[in-house]
Amino acid sequence: MPKLKTKSSAKKRFKITASGKVVAAQSTKRHGMTKRSKRSLRTRRGTALMSAADTRIVAPFMPYGL
């Protein structure tokens, strides 16, 4: 059976932890941030664990768990 390819878009956006959880950057930080509160912007720094439902969608894109 041939090797499976990893989706390039997924490997740029997501990381899989050793326990199999998917980590991604926080959303809502591209533009229009002057309307948002400082607290809202602070909480969107860094990364966050994705929900189980989203993990099931993303995991097949990275068969070898980059």
UniProtKB/Swiss-Prot annotation:
Chain intervals with Basic residues compositional bias: 28-45
Record keywords: Transferase included?
no
| Annotated Pfam families | Ribosomal_L35p
Arranged from A to Z, the UniProt key words for this protein are: Ribonucleoprotein, Ribosomal protein
Cite a single GO MF annotation.
structural constituent of ribosome
User: Which PROSITE patterns does the entry mention?
Assistant: RIBOSOMAL_L35
What are the recorded Gene Ontology BP terms?
Answer: translation
The UniProt annotation puts the region (Disordered) at 19-45
Q: Specify the superkingdom.
A: Bacteria
Question: Where does the signal peptide begin and end?
Answer: none
- One term under GO cellular component: ribosome
Give the family, as the similarity comment puts it. Answer: Belongs to the bacterial ribosomal protein bL35 family.
Q: What is this protein called?
A: Large ribosomal subunit protein bL35
Which organism is the protein's source? Anaplasma phagocytophilum (strain HZ)
Q: Species lineage, top-down?
A: Bacteria, Pseudomonadati, Pseudomonadota, Alphaproteobacteria, Rickettsiales
